[in-house]
Amino acid sequence: MRLGSNSYDVQRTEAIGQTPVKTPPPNQIRCTVTFLDSTSYHFEIEKNSLGIVLLEKVFNYLEIIEKDYFGLVFIAVDNSSAQQKKWLDPSKNLRKQMICPPYHLFFRVKFYVRDPNRLRDEFTRFQFYQQVRQNLEEGRLPCNEGSLALLASYVVQAEVGDFEEKTHGMSRTCLCYKIQFATLPDDFSDRVAELHQLHIGQTPDVAEQNFLDHARRLEMYGMDVYDGVDANHLPIEIGVGAVGIKVFHEGIKMNEYAWVRIRKLSFKKKQFQVLVANEDGVSETIMIFNIMSAKICKLLWKCCIEQHTFFRLKTPPKTPQRKVFNFGSKFRYSGRTEYQTLEENEHRKSAGHRNFHRSLSKSSFLRSTFSGNTQSIDSSRYTNTTTTDSPELPSSGQLLARRLLSAARHDTDSSDALGYASDGAVVCAPLTTPLSPRRTRDYATDSESSAPSLRQQRLSKEAIYYGTQESCDEKSWTPSMACTSTSPGIHASTASVRPVSSGSTPNGASRKSANSGYSGYGYATQTQQPTSTTNASYSPYLNGTISRSSGAAVAKAAARGLPPTNQQAYNTSSPRNSVASYSSFASAGIGGSPPRSKRSPQSNKSSSPVGEDQVVTIKMRPDRHGRFGFNVKGGADQNYPVIVSRVAPGSSADKCQPRLNEGDQVLFIDGRDVSTMSHDHVVQFIRSARSGLNGGELHLTIRPNVYRLGEEVDEPDSTMVPEPARVADSVPNSDKLSKSLQLLADSLNSGKVVDHFEMLYRKKPGMSMNICRLTANLAKNRYRDVCPYDDTRVTLQASPSGDYINANYVNMEIPSSGIVNRYIACQGPLAHTSSDFWVMVWEQHCTTIVMLTTITERGRVKCHQYWPRVFETQEYGRLMIKCIKDKQTTNCCYREFSIRDRNSSEERRVTQMQYIAWPDHGVPDDPKHFIQFVDEVRKARQGSVDPIVVHCSAGIGRTGVLILMETAACLVESNEPVYPLDIVRTMRDQRAMLIQTPGQYTFVCESILRAYHDGTIKPLAEYSKR
């Protein structure tokens, strides 16, 4: 019998057919890890497991080999209102660190490698790329608009593919979701699209590599930032990274303390102290910073210890033994150092095949747990896969406060053992740490279909026990603990991890099986060789190597009848991770190839035998001028092997894959043995390759790393202002000049003069260079990295081609005499910028041009001949130039020009002084003739207040040498002390990179002393009685 009422259980009905949420066994806990692509995955571990167990599971899940650069971060739960970001300590119990569930962690890069080229494994590079891109999107890696547009163009190239008009809207859509900053101009997407067109042909790995190489030059790259206040109660940000400690105020870097100068790090409650050695190497200065809380202060101190130990030491120091009474923190980083990581990679066996599928991160506008202080701890509780961002998201208004700086090359041959304590000072002792750039892998050959079994096999191996150790007791630490450390402090433990299902990956659905071509972003791959090229996709495996390509790029290459870019084979057993490439396909346009590290003469030696597996074949085509872009030295007639002595930036040799590097030994040229050839014969063979049987392609068989096993470390430009020794204020004014020159002589003898020079910034922080990078102005720059500051650039008023010229005003003031020497420092004119050059000379009323280069040097055009022959007239726009005098001596050429404006019929006279005795490479052996030339320039300046134009080829090297020499001469005549480093700093505040090399700086310092001691320059009578 039915009654008139009933019920319907909604909850029970919906639960029918659903898979119940699995709960971990009682003796296990579930940890949720969010990866850099915003996907999450659940890992189950034993309750009492150490952090290393979870780390190893994550590393094996992501198939990461170079593990030491990464870590897991979580939000610390405590009684304070402020949230704290902490790194998971591998050596401690996980539950004790995170207190209570949910155990939600985030996979992040912990140690940012200074040179992305050191990352051998592509999986590692991709994780770095995702991390740096995320930092950029979220405002934690500020840069100017030009740099942001360039980096964004590489992102689009890597994730969308080659630029096409029909996909231009896709590029704009991609950028709108990935880079959302309210301060960007409306035409930002168009600027990115213009740069995107220059990257046609770059495969994802090449675009990502270029992205990382440009990003690492940003000042806040790799910085772990903590808020604080300085002694003047100004809000500051303290960044800790691979190069040392940087201090920022309102987005501007105020100071930098390199690890080599730091003697001690300590903290007490909210006070963080840095003991820094002064330039004299004897005295020390204590820098005190106040941090927001005592806990954050301790985290900052720990971060400094970890960064210093990882990047500067060979092995971590031993943990001090516990005593009866312990005071101060005993924290020490016990993980593996970068040196150990590189050494292990060098001895690791070569890897086999591994399919690689990229995926786009989810939209960055969804803010995460770490986006602000108002976030509650509950917001970090996740039960399902979700979207999140990285910790510490600053306001987007800080984006344009930073400026992109070029990386300064610091040649370091030693690392320091740094003393850490909570209450005392300690001395830093040097340790030799040669870093080898060669790294390989030890994976067995397999395909993606066998990846789960591979993971299980790898997990059975010993897991390296790395992490941090801190005793419960607190005590200070003495420097001998690190200085006498000899053991690596690495322990082995066995990690037992369950096999991971092949259907679940951190990239979710984007990590598809090998048989499904993944072409959603303009790239397609497949595991088997295609029988034809109609699919616009090629196999990622060619002769046992990994290869990926853009379908569009392949089709275009095939249409031209040229080898497609994806057929560039990457041999994982080669020291270069590659065996052959075509330079014309390696890169296009901006950022074609990452710059290499400088190498010292000591690195050109090898004591170890080199096997046959280290022989690499490089293929390259000449540029449109018929040049390959490299020089060699040696030969049978010189009893020296043929070694690559120079590789020009942006040349074919620089862009080819693998890149040709300085120090490589050339064994064969187009199959011919060069061991018995003379130097001239070798050069002839290289030049003849342009018309050889290979269709103009040069084949070099080289032995890399033989003469440069110890690759030196790149560090970004230091804006810490070095302060060399100065004359004391108590010294009478009449003696300050002689005392300052004596200090200069002592610095030259000790070599400190070079150290001071290399510490000085190359480009002034905060000075923008946006005008020179506009599309209309790119062709007006002789070298793409030599650009004028926007604030001090010379602006043309009546030039048909626009107001831009690569030139800066440089004014050098002599305080006591009231003299201001005015210069216009510019690059050597190009053929199509000669008219602009003469317009500048006319508009600035210049009467003297100083030229410090010849037209060609070693067969290369250094400057266009922008003047007519003697008694001839040449038209440059509205200006008529006539050479009325041409006199040449052994060291100089003197010319006089008549310039007439056709519109106004006004005529002027301009003198050109060309110094031709400067050698093609290096500096003159004897400064005598150069001193005489500078004296003649000073005489030509007398009685004139108008600027003189000074140029060489780039307008920074020899140009800076002359400006410094003349300024020093004026200071000597005014009886003022001479500090060359201060002069260079003033010069670089007006034009970047003036005086380009340490050799040039040393030469001009020696010239100053030589001119003073010879009496060429001396104090004038009216100033000598001060």
Curated annotation (Swiss-Prot):
Substrate binds at D920, C952, S953, A954, G955, I956, G957, R958, Q996. It catalyses: O-phospho-L-tyrosyl-[protein] + H2O = L-tyrosyl-[protein] + phosphate. It is found in: Cytoplasm, Cytoskeleton. Residues 617-689 form the PDZ domain. The keyword Thylakoid does not apply. Its EC number is 3.1.3.48. Residues 29-315 form the FERM domain. GO terms for molecular function: cytoskeletal protein binding; protein tyrosine phosphatase activity. The keyword ATP-binding does not apply. Keywords: Cytoplasm, Cytoskeleton, Hydrolase, Protein phosphatase. Belongs to the protein-tyrosine phosphatase family. Non-receptor class subfamily. This is Tyrosine-protein phosphatase 1. The lineage of its organism: Eukaryota, Metazoa, Ecdysozoa, Nematoda, Chromadorea. The gene is ptp-1.
